[in-house]
Amino acid sequence: MISIFVFERSVKFVDYKKMFDKQLIGLEIDGENEEQVFEQVAEHLKNLGFVNEGYLKGITSREKKFPTGLITQHLNIALPHSDPEYVEKPFVYIARLKNEVRVKQMGDSQLMKVKNLFFLGIKDPKEQVGLLQAFMELFMNEEFVRAFIQEEDKQKIHHLFTQNI
């Protein structure tokens, strides 16, 4: 999906496919809670040069203020993201956990359980709403969700997202 944003008479095309990278898919992440999952993902992203040293603190702080858990019709997900100053290169990190963890729901901060988190590395704040909308549309599609849940190959998961977003 290519989104178009109009700001001050300029048209900006955003190709979210470029944010996906096969190195940024973790299918067996083991964490007992949200903090442990954040620590593992932040370390991996930092080692690959996608985020800077402040990312873990930034994402943890933002998640406390603005929770990102979403209950969709077919699958509960979370879309954690930090402020842009912690992001070196735009990315989407796909994290599938071994076990569910509790996160707070977007909007009302009620606790919910998720096994799939999508860490969004957004450099331009204007792109945030469009990317969040694209994810919500994907996860309302039962066929896409079924394919994602059943797939265990990173290459095929990468292809699934880049063909559908």
Named regions from a protein language model:
Residues I2-I165:
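Cytosolic covalent-transfer regions centered on His/Cys nucleophiles
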